[in-house]
Amino acid sequence: MQGSVTEFLKPRLVDIEQVNSTRAKVTLEPLERGFGHTLGNALRRILLSSMPGCAVTEVEIDGVLHEYSSKEGVQEDILEILLNLKGLAVTIEGKDEALLTLSKSGTGPVTAADITHDGDVTIVNPDHVICHLTGNNDISMRIRVERGRGYVPASARAQTEDDDRPIGRLLVDASFSPVARIAYNVEAARVEQRTDLDKLVIDMTTNGTIDPEEAIRRSATILAEQLDAFVELRDVTEQAVVEEKPEFDPILLRPVDDLELTVRSANCLKAEAIHYIGDLVQRTEVELLKTPNLGKKSLTEIKDVLASRGLSLGMRLENWPPASLADDL
């Protein structure tokens, strides 16, 4: 395979092996040597930490005041119930949070299928066991599910909660990422005579709320959007060069009529071809006094008007007049 030494091979999606509904293997090749680990590690970190999803954040169980207790007639203690609730795979459409309710009595397992919710909520794993009832007892709880990203421990949210949080409202460590497991492997690849290439194999398992292939696509989009800032560095620099300060103060480009001088003074300046304020400030007092019909009274008027605008006579302006005015003169 012949090509420029500065050209990089572009990977292509070679194979998507759907192991089951929640697990898939994605293979990309060929990659330049070293790019397998570079891309694999970046995608892995994004998939684990930056994928948006839904998770249980708060739980209220009737008759329970804190998580270090137990409930009569329930086989599991409260901490184990909270751990099981973290395993719910939920999606929410059209809003950022939802309140679910669970109420069941009798004997046997309590599963996610026993949860009551509105049409905007979908529970992907209805067979997920939450707890077991014994001795014909009952349990009721309210479960808050929120949309988020990454991992947010309960302790972090507790610090931002108000002190008037009701007793019995239990905060849950929230893992919002829909990716349950992600691993990658870099193997050797060959294209024609080149044998020093990489093949990236990504093995991923989700909680069922997102298709593995879609998760890969979203993570790659997130990475590309973040890298766009580096691609635009040159454009930002060029734009900054273009946006330089104007060569002259805009007031110097205005006609002398804007100074609202007396008719006598204005006519004297026009007779001397002084059309713009920039023309005027370059003249000295001696030069103006040589102007026919312009006396000391008019000179004083001109000096006062210029001073009120932060200007004075005898100023030196390099490259005057600018091209835009020179064309009009």
Swiss-Prot record:
The N-terminal domain is essential for RNAP assembly and basal transcription, whereas the C-terminal domain is involved in interaction with transcriptional regulators and with upstream promoter elements. DNA-dependent RNA polymerase catalyzes the transcription of DNA into RNA using the four ribonucleoside triphosphates as substrates. Belongs to the RNA polymerase alpha chain family. It comes from Shewanella frigidimarina (strain NCIMB 400). Residues 1-234 are annotated as: Alpha N-terminal domain (alpha-NTD). Keywords: DNA-directed RNA polymerase, Nucleotidyltransferase, Transcription, Transferase. This is DNA-directed RNA polymerase subunit alpha. It holds the Pfam family RNA_pol_A_bac. It catalyses: RNA(n) + a ribonucleoside 5'-triphosphate = RNA(n+1) + diphosphate. One of its GO terms (molecular function) is DNA binding. Homodimer. The RNAP catalytic core consists of 2 alpha, 1 beta, 1 beta' and 1 omega subunit. When a sigma factor is associated with the core the holoenzyme is formed, which can initiate transcription. Its EC number is 2.7.7.6. It is an enzyme of class 2 (transferase). Residues 248-329 are annotated as: Alpha C-terminal domain (alpha-CTD). One of its GO terms (cellular component) is cytoplasm. The keyword Transcription applies. One of its GO terms (biological process) is DNA-templated transcription.
